[in-house]
């Protein structure tokens, strides 16, 4: 038996290693076309503070414009320091971070599916976990996370929000206060990363209420009047850790009221610290909205409901927003894409039917089952609601809700994989005598081989698990070409216009001659400035490329004719550019200094 168990563990470790490598390779492949070759907008603005402040001043500024995100700022400072002048590395950094998140999702999905420790279900559990991670990586919602330096903000917030969900799920599964405290820690960090996740606070009270109801149910089930009916020979000797109910229906936490009270107060304490620190640093308790807007001034119930329904549509594969936010709308998508999205709905519907049928056949709806389903549903709903109250809806905010929906499917599979018998949930401090003979009975049934492994699936459930897993894989197979199609239209998203322009600007200047031959040795001149580049860009654009963070005097200047060039400007110390098309530049230095004809320029 020990040899068999060791072999199974070896296979489990091997399959896990293969899955992690596959996720890494898939993440690098799916994002191979995305690059950051220069900083602009909020990316450059944030870097400008890094360029002139130390770690503590950057992380804990005395005054902000309405946001207070010390944890994100600390990680962002470390990112700037780590990458240094290698601006091209930002996109790869974002990709690797997203891969790391997919690893967390992979393990979370395996935990939810409850299959990887079952010999007959290990392959299903590994496959579903891998599929969930891949669906996360290939989602077109990842555009901002990969193609912008501030994608770190969204990725970090998504990761911490999912870890909060994981901690609460483990707590509701009876893994004790440690899981709850881990969830509180992640919640503390996530609200100091992105303010909108304060909306997750009610989930803690849902978890505590569910655990209370579960323990109260156990108290009634294993009351003394019922335990007295158990044969004395099957009762173990009493121990100091044994906790019994005094009367049927009594409070299971009579000996741990202080712990329960602390669990209720801890989320409130975290919120008090959050709002108090905002009052001190930002000058107001209520977080600001998108682009510095005041939520209380811009909020519209009709608009918020519209954004909420739009996010639900996004989760189900329908790009209901404008193309400048999602790349291509559902109405403008190809017919075959619309057909595949319809097939994905069919897969989801069949999975839901299987899940409901499995729960119904179980015959009992426990507080734990209700609470855990509400945990996922409320998590998705709260994430949707918190991102629907501002002035616009961007797909980057849908990413966390979509990922939670994928994990919810893994949870459904895990519930189907459980046997038809409802396993008694053990409270954190409850050790009843009645649970022992029941567990002994379970062991004897398992040993007899009538129903498979101890924690395995009943034979009558194997077909349902297989069917659900195949439907999940079918959903992934159907959505893969859809996501690829959406990714092909990334260039229509609003921030890609400016990113392509600054990438082209870097290509024509510092990347063309090398930083050592450019910084401090050349000046850049741009005709007309139709792209309306600001003076801030002109001053700071090349500083991130300089290890000293100064740019060594190289800046951008705007001219309307060659006559505006300085008298000492030559082709050796100057690069003259002109906007080309709608999102790029071309080098016209030779034409400006009379070394080539203007007619030789390519047409826009």
Model regions and ranges:
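Membrane-lumen/periplasm interface segments of multi-pass, membrane-embedded glycan/lipid transferases
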Residues: 40-81, 86, 271, 275-354
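Transmembrane-helix signature of polytopic, membrane-embedded enzymes
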Residues: 105-139, 158-159
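Membrane-interface transmembrane helices that cradle and orient dolichyl/undecaprenyl
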Residues: 156, 161-180, 190, 215-218
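Signature aromatic-anchored transmembrane alpha helix within multi-pass, membrane-resident enzymes
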Residues: 241, 416-484
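Membrane-embedded, lumen/periplasm-facing catalytic core of multi-pass transferases
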Residues: 471-553
């Amino acid at each position: 038996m020990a040899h068999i168990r060791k072999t199974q563990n070896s296979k489990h470790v091997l399959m896990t290693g293969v899955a992690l490598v596959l996720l890494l390779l898939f993440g690098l492949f799916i994002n191979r076309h995305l690059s950051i070759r220069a900083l602009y907008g909020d990316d450059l603005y944030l870097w400008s503070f890094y360029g002139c402040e130390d770690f503590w001043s950057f992380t804990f500024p005395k005054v902000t414009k309405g946001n207070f995100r010390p944890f994100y700022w600390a990680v962002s400072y470390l990112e700037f320091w780590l990458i240094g002048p290698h601006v091209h590395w930002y996109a790869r950094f974002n990709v690797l971070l997203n891969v790391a998140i997919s690893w967390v999702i992979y393990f979370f999905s395996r935990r939810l599916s409850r299959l990887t420790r079952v010999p007959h279900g290990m392959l299903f559990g590994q496959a579903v976990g891998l599929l969930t991670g891949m669906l996360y990586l290939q989602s077109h919602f990842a555009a901002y996370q990969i193609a912008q330096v501030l994608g770190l903000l969204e990725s970090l917030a998504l990761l911490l929000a999912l870890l909060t969900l994981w901690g609460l799920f483990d707590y509701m599964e009876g893994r004790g206060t440690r899981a709850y405290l881990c969830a509180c820690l992640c919640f503390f960090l996530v609200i100091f990363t992105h303010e909108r996740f304060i909306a997750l606070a009610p989930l803690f009270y849902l978890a505590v209420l569910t655990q209370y109801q579960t323990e109260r149910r156990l108290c009634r089930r294993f009351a003394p009047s019922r335990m007295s009916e158990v044969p004395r020979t099957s009762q173990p000797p009493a121990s100091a850790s044994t906790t019994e109910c005094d009367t049927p229906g009594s409070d299971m936490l009579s000996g741990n009221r202080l712990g329960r009270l602390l669990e209720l107060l801890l989320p409130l304490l975290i919120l008090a610290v959050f709002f108090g620190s905002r009052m001190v640093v930002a000058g107001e308790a209520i977080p600001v909205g998108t682009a510095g807007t005041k939520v209380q001034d811009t909020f519209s119930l009709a608009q918020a409901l519209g954004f909420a329904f739009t996010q639900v549509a996004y989760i189900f594969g329908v790009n209901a927003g404008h193309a400048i936010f999602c790349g291509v709308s559902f109405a403008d998508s190809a017919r075959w894409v619309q057909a595949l999205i319809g097939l994905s709905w069919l897969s989801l519907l069949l999975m839901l039917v299987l899940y409901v049928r499995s729960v119904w056949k179980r015959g009992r709806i426990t507080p734990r089952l209700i609470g855990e389903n509400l945990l996922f549903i409320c998590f998705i709903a709260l994430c949707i609601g918190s991102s629907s109250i501002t002035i616009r809806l961007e797909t980057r905010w849908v990413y966390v809700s979509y990922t939670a929906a994928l994990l919810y499917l893994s949870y459904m599979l895990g519930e189907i994989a459980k046997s038809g018998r409802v396993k008694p949930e053990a409270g954190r401090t409850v050790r009843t005598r009645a649970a022992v003979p029941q567990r002994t009975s379970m062991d004897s049934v398992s040993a007899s081989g009538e129903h498979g492994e101890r924690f395995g699936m009943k034979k009558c459930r194997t077909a349902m698990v297989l069917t659900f897993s195949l439907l999940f894989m079918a959903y992934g197979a159907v959505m893969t070409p859809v996501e690829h199609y959406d990714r092909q239209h990334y260039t229509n998203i609003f921030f890609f216009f400016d990113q392509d322009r600054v990438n082209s600007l870097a290509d024509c200047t510092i990347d063309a001659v090398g930083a050592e031959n450019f910084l401090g040795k050349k000046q850049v001149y741009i005709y007309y400035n139709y792209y309306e580049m600001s003076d801030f860009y002109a001053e700071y654009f090349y500083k991130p490329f300089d290890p000293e963070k100064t740019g060594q005097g190289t800046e951008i200047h705007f001219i309307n004719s060659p006559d505006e060039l300085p008298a000492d400007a030559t082709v050796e110390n100057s690069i003259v550019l002109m906007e080309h098309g709608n999102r790029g530049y071309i080098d016209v230095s030779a034409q400006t200094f009379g070394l080539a004809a203007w007619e030789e320029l390519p047409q826009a």
